[in-house]
Amino acid sequence: MVCSLLGCVDCAAAQSAPQTGAEAFILMDAGSGRVLTGKNTEQELAIASTTKIMTALVALETGNLSDKVTVKQNHLKEGSSMYLRAGEVLTLEELLYGLLLPSGNDAAECIADHCSGGVERFVARMNEKAAALGMTHTSFANPSGLDTQGHYSCALDMARLAAYAMREPTFARIAATRTAAVGERMLGNHNKLLASLEGCTGLKTGYTDNAGRTLVTCCERDGMRLIAVTLNDRSDWADHAALYEYGFAAFARKRAVARGEEYTLAPVRGGTQASVSLAAGESFFYPVTAGEELLVSARLPEELTAPLTAGQAVGELIVSMDGEELARVSLVCAEPVAAAEKKQSLFERLFDRTG
């Protein structure tokens, strides 16, 4: 059985999406994955040090922040650096700050070697994680992002990676840090939007001769978190600021379904009550523009049979827009319903008395 429960939303006036100087770019809502604007979003390109988003994630999943790591001579790579010295001992957490703030290639090599016993094995884990996240246009060949054959991604994949990474509390904390003291070093974050753009909470810069300037950032205002990615973009700072101004002006985060809110009644057979209230098992938010409508419909059995427990999933809410399904949310019993005691027939009562 399907019934319409409707949701119609109002939003800010329509805005025009900005143009950028990027070879490829995307602006995506982190919560729903909706692409708000973009160009060449699935074009495979070099991504430079934005690679280190994945490096940090794999390190967090395979190592412990308090691990003691000894720097080896072969960890001291070319390019951006946190200026490690062979024989130096740091914690994995300190290396992660060196990885994400000054974009240390030496930190990347050291982390990879420690967490997997070798860079090749670590890179294999990076690719396994990319596959698990649905990054179908991505291939990693090293943990730093230095130009290497077979090392590439696309704007869409990097946005998905960034959205996932920012849900990891330790990653988000480090990515949002402007400066950090690591021993005698004072590390500064290369992401200058942290200081200049309202609501910016991360993420990662990059540059190589082949990739050009690459930038992945995250910005949050009024509960809506957006991710911007630009690849090969000389004007990336200004372009990211313009993308966010567009995104927050043209879209509003609307709650289509509220967790715990009761949506409908369902008949119950064999229970102590004839019906039960059904509520949403979780909330669902979606960014919408002016004139866009979210439709919520319920799918549930014709009849439920007691006993039922509070929180038991018995149906689902379907959220759609313009005929496209966006999400399914469980409908759960808002209260328990016990089974009614079975009434004895006259024959059963007589049998009990004579038996």
Predicted features and spans:
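Active-site-adjacent loops and short helices of periplasmic peptidoglycan-processing enzymes
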Residues: C11-P169
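C-terminal segment of classical bacterial N-terminal signal peptides
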Residues: V2-C11
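Generic detector of short alpha-helix boundary/capping microenvironments
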Residues: V2, T20-G21, Q43-E44, A86, ...
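Domain-terminus/edge residues, biased toward the C-terminal soluble/receptor-binding domains
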Residues: T136, D147-Y152, L156-G355
